[in-house]
């Protein structure tokens, strides 16, 4: 199971960086609708098979975000 709420995480990181989802979409050459669909996806942004493998091995998944140095 993925412990993170990807939708909330992306929204928080957008706020922290003073960026809207529209601007984020423009930066990666896609639409806001696609960005929204990706972060709201019910089975998440993590590969479903990978999640299943980790669950069988007895692990949950937690994503950690590390700001890149500039």
Regions from the PLM with identified roles:
Residues 1-17:
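A short, Lys/Arg-rich alpha-helix, primarily the initiator
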Residues 11, 22, 36, 51:
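Residues within the helices of the helix-turn-helix
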Residues 18-33:
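Short alpha-helical DNA-recognition segment
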Residues 48-63:
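DNA major-groove recognition helix of helix-turn-helix/homeodomain DNA-binding modules
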Residues 67-70:
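Short acidic DE-rich linear segments
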Residues 8, 18-19, 45-48:
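Residue-level signal for the short linker/turn that defines the boundary of a DNA-recognition helix
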Residues 14, 25, 54:
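The alpha-helix within a helix-turn-helix
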Residues 29-44:
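Recognition helix of helix-turn-helix/homeodomain-like DNA-binding domains
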């Amino acid at each position: 199971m993925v412990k993170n709420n990807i939708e909330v995480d992306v929204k928080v990181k957008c706020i922290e960086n003073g960026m809207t989802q529209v601007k984020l979409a423009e930066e990666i050459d896609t639409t806001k609708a696609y960005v929204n669909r990706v972060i709201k996806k019910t089975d998440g942004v993590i590969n479903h098979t990978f999640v299943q493998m980790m669950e069988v091995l007895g692990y949950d998944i937690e994503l950690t975000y590390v700001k890149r140095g500039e």
